[in-house]
Amino acid sequence: MKINTVLFDLDGTLINTNELIISSFLHTLNTYYPDQYKREDVLPFIGPSLHDTFSKIDESKVEELITSYRQFNHDHHDELVEEYETVYETVQELKKQGYKVGIVTTKARQTVEMGLKLSKLDEFFDVVVTIDDVEHVKPHPEPLQKALQLLDAKPEEALMVGDNHHDIVGGQNAGTKTAAVSWTLKGRAYLEAYKPDFMLDKMSDLLPILSDMNRS
């Protein structure tokens, strides 16, 4: 079956929001729990939803913590977000070649739109599924299924690209092929353990992979 659809995670995959996310967690947690959290303590919080993360920290303050996190994240967004090399050119080329492209993210829509506008990727994506659009987040298949439905695509014709195990397992649960990105903050070996179909060292690696898949 040929691949005609590529779904992307956003944070840590299409745009480098690592410092923004880490700073947002540290600001929020050190406001409420001074001197209890260091940088390495918040790395495991990258990937799950904010609700899941903050529920484990303090069930009674979840909404308060989310509000504090999002406010800092919003206020410091443009100064802390960076581009990844070859991302823009690769997505541009995929569109040129006629691929359907979508985003499946666990972020809220407002900050998703800020990131896409800042990176100028907003012109390429017709379908963006955020946490505001679904009941279940990755690795549950619902967000991917919703994106595929909106793109009128079948799972077996799609590839999910991401930097976290939620993306890889989410793709596997939805029945798509999967590609992990080696620039994940959690390290290449961490993602290899989830057995993605492909590992990308840079986003442009996608182009020959898709070309080979569609030739066979």
Curated annotation (Swiss-Prot):
Tell me the keywords, alphabetical order: Hydrolase, Magnesium
The EC number of this protein is 3.6.1.1
> Which residues are annotated as active site?
D9
Catalyzed reactions: diphosphate + H2O = 2 phosphate + H(+)
Which GO biological process entries does UniProt record here?
DNA repair
Which SUPFAM superfamilies does the record associate with it?
A: HAD-like
Hydrolase is among the record's keywords: yes
Write out the similarity annotation: Belongs to the HAD-like hydrolase superfamily. PpaX family.
What is the documented function of this protein? Hydrolyzes pyrophosphate formed during P-Ser-HPr dephosphorylation by HPrK/P. Might play a role in controlling the intracellular pyrophosphate pool.
PANTHER family in the record, alphabetically?
Answer: PHOSPHOGLYCOLATE PHOSPHATASE, PYROPHOSPHATASE PPAX
Protein name, UniProt field = Pyrophosphatase PpaX
Species source reads Bacillus cereus (strain AH187)
Which gene underlies this protein? ppaX
